[in-house]
Amino acid sequence: MRVVILGSGVVGVASAYYLARAGHEVTVIDREAGPALDTSFANAGQISPGYAAPWAAPGVPLKAVKWMFEKHAPLAIRLDGTRFQLQWMWQMLRNCTTERYALNKGRMVRLAEYSRDCLQALRAETAIQYEGRTGGTLQVFRTQQQLDGAAKDIAVLREANVPFELLSSDELKKAEPALAAVSHKLTGGLRLPGDETGDCQLFTTRLAALAEQLGVKFRFNTRIDALAVAGGKIAGVQCGGEMVRADAYVVALGSYSTNLVASLVKIPVYPLKGYSITAPIVDAAKAPVSTVLDETYKIAITRFDDRIRVGGMAEIVGFDKRLRDARRGTLEMCVNDLFPGGGDTAKATFWTGLRPMTPDGTPIVGRTPVPNLFLNTGHGTLGWTMSCGSGQLLADLMSGKKPAIRADDLSVHRYLSETDGEHRPAYA
């Protein structure tokens, strides 16, 4: 089957790789000059299945009000005047219940754990290198309230059989020796030894090269204008003056997916703006070993070979990609507070990207009401974590194979159905 994939971020490239491996003839189209040059370019560098959780959580609405008055708040909202933004925020609010949080987190962990299995198999088969580390990830808490609040996440981890370690402030240095200097600031931590880290952009670039070896064709610097429809199916992709045709089409355009398919299917994928800095390491002994997540500021600090990536925060501001100095200041403050002297933040590069977020946190993977149109989008902050599993899942669905995990509650139909009350998230 001839398949056109729109988007060459980590999710699009993973989709291409697994579809090609399943025997399909695949073409990837992207407006950028190469793979992973937009949202996947400088993310936090985590592969964290155990930390897969929706932003829509109990207590978040009240926290959001408090964060409005904080200098280093992890969430900021600026109304853009669109109905879609208001609808999306209302849908997210309706998912901030204990019941829906547990349901949504369970789905996310299921896909994320499967995706890590797929990544490990890929690494064993191809020996792909991307500055990867398998030292786990550590979430650190600055207050007893945060430590106590981890109980609901631990319950989900237990149910999903995800290994974890609950550490005291003195035990944190066992996982991250450099934290010994600041242990007095911390009350404890939650460590997931099975999580991994690495450079997502490097991974995507090298996976694209592996996909090319399987026959995948990449068309970069190519504008994507519209999907042409005929007879109730997609007839082609309008790329400037050219119509690109195939048997099936996959939209993996992240936050840009929503507008492209708007006339065919309504999907609640909104751009959640995030930031990162990448600083050179100046003292390895004072730098992190793997990834440390600061629960207070919702910031991840990740060790690469000779660099530290610091990423996080969320702004609900539409497609505004302006870099804000205040956000850089928060990232620098956080890494210098936990790992003083580890990296040179004065020489750090500064970046922003738009995470494609659904109101329930779960991505949209699978079929649509249009017979030959498929979606692989809405992964939020977990694009890399879920990429391989989403790609393999989609390849199985498009090849007529039964997926290795449950997939029906990952498709867009969970938003469209009026009868699937148990697994249908709030969507007005």
From Swiss-Prot:
Pathway entry: Amino-acid degradation; D-alanine degradation; NH(3) and pyruvate from D-alanine: step 1/1
Record key words, sorted: FAD, Flavoprotein, Oxidoreductase
Molecular function per GO: D-amino-acid dehydrogenase activity
EC number(s) recorded for this UniProt protein: 1.4.99.-
GO BP annotations, alphabetical order: D-alanine catabolic process
Disulfide pattern: none
Pfam families: DAO
GO CC annotation: cytoplasm; plasma membrane
Keyword ATP-binding on entry: no
Homology family: Belongs to the DadA oxidoreductase family.
Function: Oxidative deamination of D-amino acids.
Protein name: D-amino acid dehydrogenase
